[in-house]
Design a protein with these regions (language model features):
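Basic, alpha-helical interaction scaffolds
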Residues: 281, 350-419
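Short, conserved micro-motifs composed of acidic
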Residues: 49, 246, 308, 323-357
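A glycine-rich beta-turn/hairpin centered on an aromatic-Pro dipeptide
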Residues: 332-338, 435, 456-508
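Active-site palm subdomain of RNA-directed nucleic acid polymerases
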Residues: 147-165, 190, 266-295, 396
């Protein structure tokens, strides 16, 4: 489906060329006009990054990994062609890449982008509801990968990126961020304390990053030498045009932002927002531009501290020219008591609106930390998708039907389930019902006398409840073995005794956590500790993630007959 007629003010745009021009004008209108009276950052105390040298072997490896089906950029150099002639072209690209790094300049074609408009949500007739995705030169992206690898390794090795940031980082994910936040909230809930959560929404965050301020932060964090010079050239003199069904808008200059769709864009954004956590006394959690701030409220002093932290975020946004969308910023109180008086918090001069639920990283959080609403939403979405698949693939064989369920329906039921794994029988039953309907569809058996359990067994499908348990245990295993996202969460667990092996981490059971409420009892940590303790010592002692995964599955990989 294409983009319908667009409306901007009193004007309506119908033809593809008009719509492309309208979208491009809107995308350019949100760029930041940077304040040149910039207060420099203090002299850096971070080590300086060394120069990058590109090797032919590294370029060849990246060329081998190219997805030949991806689109080319404005230079129209096909990724499929690059992959096919990789052996011949790798030495040439290596020379060009090293020259580009040494001279700190890029070919003009590398600074252009064909922009495609991706609908987010809301009315499709409004340009404001589209996100610009840049298609750039594939050759440039290969060099971006090399620079990304070097810069991200430097930042991680020197512990520069805050551990509160879980976006675009190896070992971190939406799920790890959700697990940590919900663990904090449910534990406070268990103790009878109220937690006030402030939810912030940046307006066009990736498009508004001012370039000079970004370069100043890169220098402050130690990004130096040819990488720094190259990134500066990468951001300077960029142009873009919107492409829609073959129609193209006029070229426009890109005055701010990190281009969405590039390799370096997400990493540059992480660097830019990294110091937002400075001087914050409450708990702050980031996933790229998603930001929440929360604190246990035991007295008015805590409310004032949270307000001071909100003020700090507002001051940061003004200094670094990043705007909050105040109408989408909210406050929510998590509490066992229904009689507490909500405090009033302000972002600048605007009071934050109080809500009883909000969606964080794709999961609906309610003020009582129950999962009824989220389960209902997930089940409805998965059921609608299953119905769509059934209507369109009813003539296909069982193998195709099974693949359609596994790839299109089940992921909707299992997104981030380690964080919100439901425990009430009604929620568990509602989720399992979708899979039971899918089993009948795959097996083409709708007879009332047929046991659905036998159909599930013949398909070798684990129950979704068991799969959620395994997902939690896998996260727990990763945390024990030093994967970044959750390592601190399990490091603080009490261990009654200590049994060690030379080749792996501890295999001892952990002490169970005291719980007063079901909300905390069935949250990730207390629940998974019990599940971990129930595993055989031999399974707990495995050092390989894949071996541990296979042990949990328990040999359910047999072929299915249809």
């Amino acid at each position: 489906m294409g983009i319908p007629d667009l409306s901007s003010g009193t004007q309506t745009f119908s033809s593809d060329s008009e719509k492309a021009e309208c979208l491009n004008n809107y995308f350019c209108s949100v760029f930041t006009k940077e304040d040149q009276n910039f207060l420099p950052l203090p002299k850096t105390a971070h080590p300086r990054m060394s120069n990058i040298t590109v090797t032919c072997h590294g370029v060849l490896k990246l060329l081998e990994g190219i997805n030949g089906k991806k689109s080319s950029g404005p230079d129209e150099i096909s990724p499929r062609i690059l992959k096919e002639v990789r052996v011949e072209i790798a030495p040439i690209l290596t020379f060009i890449f090293n020259q580009s790094l040494q001279q700190g300049c890029l070919p003009t074609d590398w600074l252009t982008a064909n922009v495609f408009a991706l609908h987010k949500k809301g009315s499709k007739t409004s340009p404001e509801n589209y996100r610009p995705i840049s298609l750039t030169s594939v050759c440039c992206k290969i060099l971006e990968h090399i620079i990304y690898s070097a810069v991200s390794r430097f930042l991680e090795d020197n512990n520069i990126i805050t551990p509160r940031q879980h976006g675009f980082r190896s070992g971190y994910s939406c799920e790890t961020q959700l697990i940590l936040a919900i663990n904090d909230w449910s534990h406070s809930f268990d103790l009878g304390h109220r937690t006030d959560v402030a939810i912030f929404d940046f307006s066009k965050a990736f498009d508004k990053v001012p370039h000079k301020r970004l370069l100043a932060k890169l220098a402050y964090y130690g990004i130096a030498g040819n990488a720094f010079n190259w990134i500066g050239a990468f951001l300077h003199n960029r142009t873009q045009r919107v492409v829609l069904n073959g129609s193209k808008s006029a070229w426009s200059s890109v005055d701010s932002g990190v281009p969405q769709g590039t390799v370096l864009g997400p990493l540059l954004f992480l660097v830019y927002v990294n110091d937002i956590v400075s001087d914050i006394k409450s708990e702050i959690r980031l996933f790229a531009d998603d930001c929440i701030l929360y604190r246990e409220i035991k007295s008015t002093v805590d409310s004032q501290i949270l307000q001071d932290d909100i003020n700090s975020l507002f001051s940061w946004s003004k200094l670094w020219q990043m705007e909050f969308n105040v109408s989408k910023c909210h406050i929510m109180s998590l509490s066992r008591s229904k009689k507490h008086v909500n405090a009033i918090y302000k972002l600048g001069n605007a009071a934050l609106s109080a809500v009883h639920s909000f969606t964080y990283l794709g999961v609906e959080i309610t003020c009582d930390l129950r999962w009824n609403n989220h389960v209902a939403t997930v089940v409805k979405k998965a059921s609608n998708t299953l119905n769509f698949v059934r209507r369109n693939l009813y003539r296909c064989n069982g193998h195709v039907k099974e693949l359609s369920y596994i790839s299109l329906v089940r992921p909707l039921l299992e997104y981030a389930t380690a964080a919100w794994d439901p425990y009430t029988s009604c929620n568990i039953k509602d989720i399992e019902m979708v899979q039971r309907r899918a089993a009948r569809y795959v097996k083409r058996d709708y007879q009332r006398t047929t046991s659905v359990t036998s159909l599930l067994d013949s398909l070798h499908w684990q129950s979704l409840q068991d799969r959620r348990r395994n997902a939690r245990l896998l996260h727990f295993f990763k945390a024990l073995h030093g994967y970044q996202g959750l390592s601190q969460l399990v490091n603080d667990l009490p261990r009654p005794t200590r049994l060690t092996r030379s080749s792996c981490v501890d295999v001892v059971a952990f002490s169970q956590l005291p719980c007063r409420t079901d909300v905390f009892k069935f949250s990730f940590l207390p629940r998974t500790v019990i599940d971990w303790n129930s595993l055989d010592t031999g399974v707990r002692g495995l050092s390989s993630l894949e071996s541990f995964r296979q042990a949990l599955v328990g040999g359910r990989s047999a072929a299915t007959s249809y």
